[in-house]
C-alpha cells in the first residue's frame, strides 16, 4: 500500500475514534456508490452525520479543511441521500462534517472537527 493510502487510512481511524469520543456512533465507513465514497457515517443523537476526513502530514499544501470546497460539499450531500436510499432510511436531520487530521508521524496527531459545514 502506498504511503499516501496508509496516511489516509490512519487519519480515518483517528477521526472515527475522535467522533466516538464525542458521543457519536459510527454506523458505516468507506461506503461507496457510483457517485463516490463517504468516509464515515455516524449518528449524533437524532442527526445522521456524513463525515469527510482529510489527512495531511503538514500544512505545506494548505490546511486539510481547504480541500473541501463547494463541489465536494454538494457531492457529499448527494452521497448522503444515496446512502439513505440504499439503507431505506429516512433521516430528516442530516449534516456534513469535516474532520482534519494533521499527522507528521513524529508526535501526537492533531484532530480538528468542523460540524455542519454545508
UniProtKB/Swiss-Prot annotation:
Signal sequence, start to end: none
Listed Gene3D superfamilies: 3.40.1350.10
GO molecular function: nucleic acid binding
Sequence similarity: Belongs to the UPF0102 family.
Protein name (database record): UPF0102 protein Arth_2474
Source organism of the structure: Arthrobacter sp. (strain FB24)
